[in-house]
Structure formats: structure tokens, C-alpha cells
Design a protein with these regions (language model features):
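Gly/Thr-rich phosphate-binding beta-strand-loop-beta motif of the actin/hexokinase/Hsp70
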Residues: 1-25, 131-148
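Hydrophobic aliphatic residue packing
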Residues: 2, 75, 102-106, 143, ...
Length: 172
């Protein structure tokens, strides 16, 4: 099985897929505490919801071989997050691998969306794809010549939000 986790600022989505990329059941959605708690509390909550999902779906944990995580914000090629869950060593990827005891892939939510659409979705047979994510911030996942484009430092397409002079807005 494959564990998929989408950690948003307002939601936490957890799903388990078979090797044909079919969800065992629908994607389970929980409220998110990403901005309400410190990193340790957030990770405990994520672990609790992963465990709850595994139990609800009656899946043998030993059969889950890999996990994929999507996070908002700036994430580099090595899976280090600079916006949320900003652990320095071993980084959020390493912490999740220690927590779950399986390999973890982690990327920006817009990149994950672009890769999913290019691999399984409406852009399956398209070489160049732009996927725009508009939530609290704006993100862009780019597939160019059938490859995810990351840019020079691995964070291409993540706009976040742009401050406009005279308007008050909190930065995330």
C-alpha cells in the first residue's frame, strides 16, 4: 500500500492507495492545526490521524511500503520545508521517515498536484502542464517536457502572496 498525506493550512487529508493507485476508501479529511500549534504538536496530530485512518480502513500497517506528503510553502529538492514544519536536522523528511519507519517522499502541494495530473489525471498525455493552486496563497506546479520543473534552487512556482502597499495582510 501507499500512504498519501496532504497537510494544508485548513485541512489534513489522509488516504491509503493500492499499487494500482486506487484509494482503499475515499480520502479522509480532518481539520488542520498547522498554524495553531508548534511543530511537535502538529506532527503528533498528523501521526494520530494517520493511525486513525489505518485503523478505520483496517489496513495492515506492515503492508504500507511508502508515504507521500504534500505541504504548502517552500520545500527544496531534499524535502526540507522552509515555511511549515521547519526542522533543520534531519529535516521534516527524515523526521517523517523515523516516525513512520518507511520511505517518505515530500514536496510542495502544487508540485504534487502537477505530478498527479501528469501521471494519472487530465494531463496524462501532455508534455507541458501548468497547475495553479489558489488557496490562501498561490502556487504553481510546472511540468516541462514531461518533467517536473523545480528551478535553480528547487522552489520554482511558489508565489505565496504578494504584499500590496496600504493593505494589511498577515504573512504566512
Amino acid at each position: 500500500y501507499i500512504l498519501g498525506v496532504d497537510i494544508g493550512r485548513e485541512y489534513l487529508r489522509v488516504a491509503i492507495f493500492n499499487l494500482k493507485n486506487e484509494p482503499i476508501e475515499g480520502i479522509l479529511e480532518y481539520s488542520s492545526i498547522l498554524e495553531e500549534q508548534d511543530d511537535e504538536a502538529t506532527l503528533r496530530y498528523v501521526r494520530e490521524k494517520i493511525d486513525e485512518t489505518i485503523g478505520r480502513l483496517n489496513v495492515d500497517r506492515a503492508k504500507i511500503k511508502v508515504a507521500g506528503f504534500a505541504l504548502p510553502g517552500l520545500i527544496d529538492r531534499e524535502g526540507t520545508s522552509y515555511t511549515y514544519l521547519t526542522y533543520e536536522h534531519p529535516g521534516i523528511k527524515g523526521i517523517l521517515e523515523e516516525m513512520l519507519q518507511i520511505p517518505v517522499f515530500i514536496d510542495n502541494d502544487s508540485n504534487v498536484m502537477a505530478m498527479a495530473e501528469h501521471t494519472f489525471g487530465v494531463a496524462k498525455d501532455v508534455n507541458n502542464v501548468l497547475c495553479v493552486s489558489v488557496n490562501e496563497c498561490i502556487g504553481l506546479g510546472m511540468i516541462l517536457n514531461s518533467k517536473l520543473y523545480r528551478g535553480g534552487i528547487g522552489m520554482a512556482g511558489e508565489f505565496g502572496h504578494i504584499r500590496i502597499s496600504g493593505l494589511e495582510a498577515s504573512c504566512h
